[in-house]
Structure formats: C-alpha cells, structure tokens
C-alpha cells in the first residue's frame, strides 16, 4: 500500500530513478516469428511491444531510457532511433548475450548511481509507475517487485509475499526473517525498482537477475518489497501469447490507461476499398491496404504496409508489415516470410 502522503507526487519526484528496458533476449520461444522480429519489436495492435513500456515511463516523468540489445540489436536500434515514445534512448550493446543480470551490470555506467526502474521489453501492462516508485522509496528497499495474482504462480516461479507486502520467498529461497501474517504466492511481472545495493551484486557476465541478485539478497535478510498490479498484463514470449495479447487489446483498448497509440479502428490513412468488408473489432493501420472483395475481422490486425488481397478472409489474426494475406487466414500471424499458425487454446 502506498502511503497517502506519497500519492500523486509530481513526475519530477516519481522519476528519481533511471529507466532500463531489457531487450536483448534471443526470442527463441517465438519460433518463426522471432526469426523475423525480436520480441521487443513484435507489433501489438500496430505498435512495437517495447514502446508500451517506454510510453509508461515517459508518462511517469522519465526523459531518458537505456535499452540493452543483442539479438537483432541493429534492427531494434534502427526502429527506435535516438528518441522513441517521448524518451531519449541510449543503447547498451552486448557483444555476447549477458542475461537479465549481466545486462543490467553492463549498463550501470549509463544508468548512473541511483535506483533503476527495470522492465522487460516484451511486457505490456497497465502500469502505474509513480505508485511503484513511491512504494520503493517509502520503504528504502533493496528492490521492489511488481507482482500480480495468477491461478498458477508456480509455473512462472512463485514469489511469496507476507501480509505487510514484504517478499519472504523467491523460488526455493527464504528470507531469514519470519513472515508477518499469511503468505500469498504471486507472479513476477518483470517490472521492478532496483537499488544500487542489489545491482552491485551483478557482474557484466552472463547471469540471472533473480538467481544471482534477488535470491542472495533475500537470503542475506535484505528488504525486498512487493507492489501489486491489479490491471491488464500480457507477455508475448510465444506465438500463442502474442496473438492473445493483440486480440485482448483489440477487443478492449481501455485495458491500458495510456498506450503508445491507437489500438483499434481504421486509420484515416489506411487504404480500404469500397468493396471490402470490415467486421469489428479490427485495427487497420495507416498505409495498410485492404482490397475490394476482402473480408477482415472480427479480431484482425492489419499493420502498416500490410496487404489483404481480394477474396481473402482474415479473422483472429495479425498481418505484419510487408506481408500479404491471401485465402482464408484464421488463428495465425502472417509475416513476409509466410503464415505462422497459432494454437489459440495454448495461450
């Protein structure tokens, strides 16, 4: 719970932390999709996934972010450039993949001496970052983890939280301090605030932020706090989760308080022929083309530079930039390299 005197502070207070988005993973679980685009750039209703986190940080008062890159790092840098979503962007380039822990350590010079707000670039969530930072500051914690309820937190690596909001267990590690009240198991969202003391445990070699920093800090009795995310959350590590994330926001754009752009509807700059049929909800981006005789929707996203030809039927699908949809396309992602079928029930 954030104390009342810390709520609604101006952005200059809220962002007394540097910002980092973790964007260097290999994207292997995305399969063929990850060969075309790295996870930070997969489009969610037409916007690269990483821009959702950047936008949230900008709205919280940040002016700059650090992004680490490895897999397809050149493409990430070319897409975001020196500014993205209202933030100046600096890049921590990894010659070898360093993992979540090594990635943070490698970026320390760019992050500066204070605390760091670190987010996973594949995550899209309804974030209240000022509240998270206020919670961290109120308790002087070594780290503050943004957690959420999940029916099966064990599959993500459960985090145990006591009645006061203190983290008492991470994976199989336990705090030496007994919990106060009941312990609830929750899922870690990949959004966190790290004090310098926690980052000092990391080296710029391949290592894991949880296992190589959080776990030893917890076992040493350091204070790790938990904040709770009550709103929308999605991560896009697999084709199934990727498609589900697109469709969730397409159906209900109001799940996010401040997305990086429009999530549903037809952009005025889209080229939709008079003889095309659109069945809501759809997102037809600027520069997308839907030919006469094509049917798009329900539940379809056509990205900028994508094309749906005459006679095609697209539903429960995303058509990426540079791709052409033909025939009957459903439960799929269409890329310039081909169609990736998605098992929607596996999401």
Spans of model-derived segments:
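Structural signal for interior beta-strand "rungs" in well-ordered beta-sheet cores
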Residues: 260-347
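Catalytic-core segments of class I nucleotidyltransferases/pyrophosphorylases
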Residues: 115-117, 124, 130-137, 150-153, ...
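Glycine-rich phosphate-binding loop at the start of an alpha helix
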Residues: 51, 101, 105, 282, ...
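Intrinsic-disorder-associated, low-complexity terminal segments enriched in Asp/Asn/His/Tyr and depleted
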Residues: 5-8
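A structural signal for short hydrophobic beta-strand segments in well-ordered beta-sheet cores
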Residues: 41, 159-161, 214, 226
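Conserved beta-loop-beta/alpha segment of the NTase-like Rossmann-fold superfamily
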Residues: 76-163, 203
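Short internal beta-strands
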Residues: 66-69, 146-147, 318
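N-terminal glycine-rich phosphate-binding loop and ensuing alpha1 helix
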Residues: 11-77
